Each structure stands twice: as structure tokens, then as C-alpha cells.
């Protein structure tokens, strides 16, 4: 089991050395340039760059360290205010992006959460030590099968499913959410199956073209599968180049570029190192065209970040909000242990936000909230009572209560019933109109998290500079972290080239409809 942990946890979760490719193959790639031809309809390439942020992006461009991104920016439209999903964790964001729905509909609550029906903690990869305690096999099964085929609600449709119904083809490269209508077989590397109880194959449903590291690839000569089992940027870019060179790029392609996230977590939000590295990969893609400008012919490029990151205080004792310590009077479910009759609460920390679950009738959700309200590092605490969401804060008197429907409207034309102290979520009101300040689209995003799962639970959100930890949570003191609803974690850049078609609402949850409208 130790060997398996090293293979999966380190290979998948930790960036290793640069992938080893075949030089002859790389030379062949350079020679095989694309011949541009006119097409009847444009093709859309969506590049999702994990933790791409406005300030380091602009800095890298100004210092001429990101010529590919500078090229796209020069030839496109730009905004730094695309609103992410909530929690601002990749799996939830990916779910909103690909389904056009918040977690109340997609049912993907976060990177780690407690399944009230199964009475177990689910993780999609929140740090090596947490995975070790919860079980590597269960984690692998979640990623390989459960996530797309079970957990993602059947009541929402992915962009791949909608495109299939429109008789359009699509591709997914290294994106963990990819559900579609085509049957695929994911093959687990033999090195892993030999030392584990994982099956050799997983059956899954995806788009017509699916690439996911060493588990499934289109280019059999793509040798970038050593580093993180192919779940790396070099692998992803080689797959995109292959589709372009073979002229098999479908109407829609989503490509996930992940490694910048690891760099920002370690070095902090100001670093440009990750951007400089990923830009070299984008240069590889542009270089296969006779001229970079040819890449824009009949191709619409959409480049987005998924979440921002905010700096975490260097001093661990101050930076890390230890929820086990704060709630030490309660009996807390241990990671990897079955629920016992004496257990009272479950803690699942998602970096700068956390879910705290009541699993014993003797516990009061309000009492837990009241206890957490005394910690000055926590921005606010929320829970639900019937159809109403209640929010309190240590910085403000009283409470704020809201639910969907009512006489108040926000800039997204969403109607709400609200009462109480609006300062808690930094809302301002004018003539029945709601304006968001520190928490963009705060009501819909918080409602989405509160309705994402069953049971009684609390949502806690940290102030900038602080991060929650549970039993074995990863921590990023001195670096960067995300997860919260605050604008520092929530506003990301977007670059769009090749079209003047406006996006009605600058939210990740709205991009699916905007893309599908190209073929309506």
C-alpha cells in the first residue's frame, strides 16, 4: 500500500520533473505545420488555466515573459472580472463550467465533502495525507468513475451531452469533468494495478474525443505520461497539437492546464513562474501554424482562469484556522473511520472554506455557528433552516436571512427575499436592487453550496489571509490558497478571440450557454 500511495499520490498530486519526450517525434511535429483553410463554421477551443490571475498575467506580459498570452490578448477581448463558482475549488468550478449550473443542481459540493446518505467522507484529491487516511483506492475510484458517472447529477446536462444532441462533436483533454454520450475505456497503468486492488480498466461516458493522461490518449506517440501519470500540461498540449495537425479538431474542445495552480500554492499569488511555463506550451501550439495569426482563422479561442488565489499569512499559528481545535468540545469523526453513534460532527476543509456537518441529534447547528463566530479570522458562517439561509458574522450585529424569489433583484436578474443585516455579505441596496461588493453573485453562489447536499451542515468562509485546516488538510501558509467566496478568490481573467459575440453575464456558470448559442 505504501508503494501505491507513492505512485498515485506523488505522481498525480505533486509536480515532478519535466516530462520526457522523444526528440524525433518532436522534430516531426515541428515539420508538420497546419494548412489553414476556410470552414463553414468556427471551432471553439476553451483553455482553462488553473489559478490564472489578472495581476501576474499582466506582469508576465509587460515583462515579455508570456508572448503567446500577449498575442491572444492583443487579438481578443479581455476582462478580469469573470465570476467563479463556489466553493472556489476546481471540481466545483469545473462542474459549473461544463453544466452551466451551480452545486445545488450539479451536486458537486466541493473537493472534499460528507455524503450524508452513505455516511462517508468523499474526496477528489485534497492533499496526499488526507487521501492516505480516507483510502487511495476510494480516491482513485472517485476520480476514475464516481465523479462523472455517479456523483454528477443526472438532472443536469454537460456541454458535451448538449452538443451531441445538436449533432456536434466535442473533445475533452485532461479535464476531470467530461461526461458525454460515448463509451470509453480508461486503462489503469499496470504499475499501479500490480500493487493495488484497482481494476485494470474503468468504463466511462465522455465526449467523442477523450484524453485523460495515461488513462486514455489520442496520440499514441504522446510520451508525456511520466510526470503525474500524464495529468500535466505537456501531455495536454501535445494532444491538442495532434488534433490540430490531423485536422480532427471537433466543433468544441476543452483543454485543462493545471500546473500553474501548484506553483501559485507554493510561491504565492504574485508569482509569474507558472504563467511563464504554461506560455511556452501555448507557443508550441501557435508554432504549428504557418503564422500565429493563422491560429485565429475559423478558431475561437477562449482562455479563462478557474479561480483566483489569495495570499496566506506566513505565520502558521495565525494563518491556519484549526477547526478541530475550535470545535474540540465536540466528538469529531476521524478520517477513514466509520461513523459511530458517539460521533457528533464532521469537518471537511476546502482550503479557505469548510463544511461542518451535524451527525448527532444532540448537537445544535446554531451553537456550532455561535462558537465559530468568536474567531476573528472567519468572515461569516451560514446554515439553512427550511427554505431560508441564515448568515452571521463576528464583525456585524444580528443576522442576514435570504431565499430565492421575492421583490429584490440583483444584476443577474435573480429575484430574492432578504431581511436582516446586509452588511454581513457586503450587499448594498438601492430601490430594491441588490449590488454585490466583496462577494460577487454571493446570494446565488452561497445558495448553491447550501443546497448542494442533504443533511444539516454549516458553511464557513475565511477572511483573506487565512485558511481552514482539519485533521490532515493541506496548508499553504506563506503561499496562496482559494476556496472562499471573497472576490480575491472569485474574480478571474477571460480572453476571447475570433468573435465579437458578447457574454451577457460574466460568470463561469454562463459560459456553457454562450458557447452553445454559436450553433443555435
What are these model-predicted stretches?
Residues 50-51, 305-308, 464:
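Active-site metal-binding loops of divalent metal-dependent hydrolases
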Residues 101-102, 106-265, 420, 427, ...:
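His/Asp/Glu-rich, glycine-adjacent segments
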Residues 151-152, 228-237, 267, 271-281, ...:
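Phosphate/oxyanion-binding active-site loops and adjacent basic polyanion-contact surfaces
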Residues 152-156, 342-502, 508, 512:
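Active-site neighborhoods of enzymes that stabilize oxyanions during catalysis
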Amino acid at each position: 500500500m505504501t508503494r501505491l500511495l507513492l505512485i498515485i499520490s506523488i505522481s498525480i498530486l505533486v509536480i515532478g520533473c519535466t516530462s520526457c519526450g522523444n526528440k524525433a517525434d518532436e522534430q516531426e511535429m515541428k515539420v508538420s505545420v497546419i494548412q489553414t483553410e476556410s470552414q463553414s463554421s468556427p471551432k471553439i477551443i476553451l483553455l482553462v488555466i488553473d489559478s490564472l490571475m489578472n495581476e501576474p498575467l499582466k506582469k508576465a506580459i509587460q515583462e515579455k515573459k508570456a508572448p503567446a498570452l500577449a498575442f491572444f490578448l492583443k487579438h481578443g477581448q479581455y476582462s478580469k472580472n469573470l465570476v467563479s463558482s463556489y466553493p472556489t475549488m476546481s471540481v466545483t468550478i469545473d462542474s459549473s463550467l461544463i453544466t452551466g449550473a451551480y452545486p445545488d443542481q450539479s451536486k458537486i459540493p466541493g473537493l472534499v465533502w460528507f455524503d450524508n446518505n452513505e455516511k462517508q467522507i468523499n474526496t477528489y484529491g485534497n492533499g496526499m495525507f488526507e487521501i492516505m487516511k480516507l483510502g487511495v483506492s476510494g480516491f482513485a475510484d472517485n476520480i476514475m468513475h464516481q465523479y462523472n458517472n455517479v456523483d454528477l447529477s443526472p438532472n443536469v446536462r454537460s456541454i458535451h451531452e448538449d452538443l451531441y444532441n445538436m449533432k456536434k462533436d466535442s473533445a475533452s483533454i485532461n479535464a476531470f469533468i467530461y461526461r458525454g454520450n460515448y463509451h470509453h475505456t480508461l486503462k489503469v497503468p499496470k504499475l499501479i494495478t500490480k500493487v493495488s486492488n484497482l481494476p485494470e480498466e474503468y468504463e466511462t461516458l465522455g465526449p467523442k474525443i477523450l484524453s485523460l493522461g495515461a488513462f486514455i490518449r489520442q496520440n499514441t506517440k504522446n510520451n508525456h505520461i511520466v510526470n503525474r501519470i500524464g495529468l500535466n500540461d505537456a501531455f495536454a498540449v501535445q494532444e491538442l497539437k495532434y488534433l490540430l495537425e490531423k485536422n480532427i479538431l471537433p466543433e468544441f474542445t476543452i483543454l485543462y492546464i493545471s500546473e500553474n495552480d501548484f506553483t501559485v500554492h507554493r510561491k504565492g499569488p504574485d508569482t509569474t513562474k507558472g504563467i511563464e511555463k504554461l506560455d511556452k506550451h501555448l507557443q508550441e501550439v501557435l508554432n504549428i501554424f504557418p503564422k500565429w495569426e493563422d491560429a485565429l482563422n475559423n478558431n475561437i479561442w477562449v482562455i479563462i482562469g478557474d479561480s483566483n488565489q489569495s495570499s496566506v499569512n506566513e505565520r502558521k499559528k495565525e494563518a491556519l484556522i484549526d477547526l478541530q481545535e475550535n470545535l474540540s468540545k465536540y466528538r469529531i469523526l476521524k478520517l477513514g473511520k466509520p461513523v459511530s453513534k458517539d460521533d457528533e460532527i464532521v469537518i471537511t476543509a476546502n482550503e479557505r472554506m469548510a463544511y461542518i456537518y451535524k451527525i448527532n441529534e444532540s448537537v445544535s447547528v446554531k451553537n456550532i455557528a455561535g462558537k465559530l463566530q468568536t474567531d476573528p479570522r472567519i468572515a461569516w458562517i451560514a446554515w439553512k433552516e427550511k427554505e431560508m439561509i441564515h448568515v452571521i458574522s463576528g464583525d456585524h450585529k444580528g443576522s442576514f436571512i435570504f431565499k430565492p424569489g421575492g421583490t429584490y433583484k440583483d444584476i443577474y436578474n435573480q429575484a430574492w427575499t432578504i431581511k436582516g443585516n446586509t452588511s454581513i455579505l457586503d450587499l448594498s441596496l438601492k430601490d430594491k436592487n441588490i449590488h454585490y461588493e466583496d462577494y460577487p453573485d454571493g446570494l446565488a453562489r452561497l445558495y448553491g453550496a447550501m443546497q448542494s447536499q442533504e443533511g444539516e451542515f454549516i458553511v464557513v468562509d475565511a477572511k483573506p489571509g487565512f485558511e481552514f485546516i482539519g485533521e490532515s488538510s493541506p496548508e499553504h501558509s506563506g503561499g496562496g490558497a482559494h476556496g472562499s467566496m471573497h472576490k480575491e478568490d472569485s474574480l478571474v481573467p477571460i480572453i476571447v478571440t475570433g468573435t465579437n459575440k458578447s457574454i451577457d453575464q460574466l460568470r463561469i456558470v454562463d459560459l456553457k450557454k454562450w458557447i452553445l448559442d454559436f450553433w443555435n
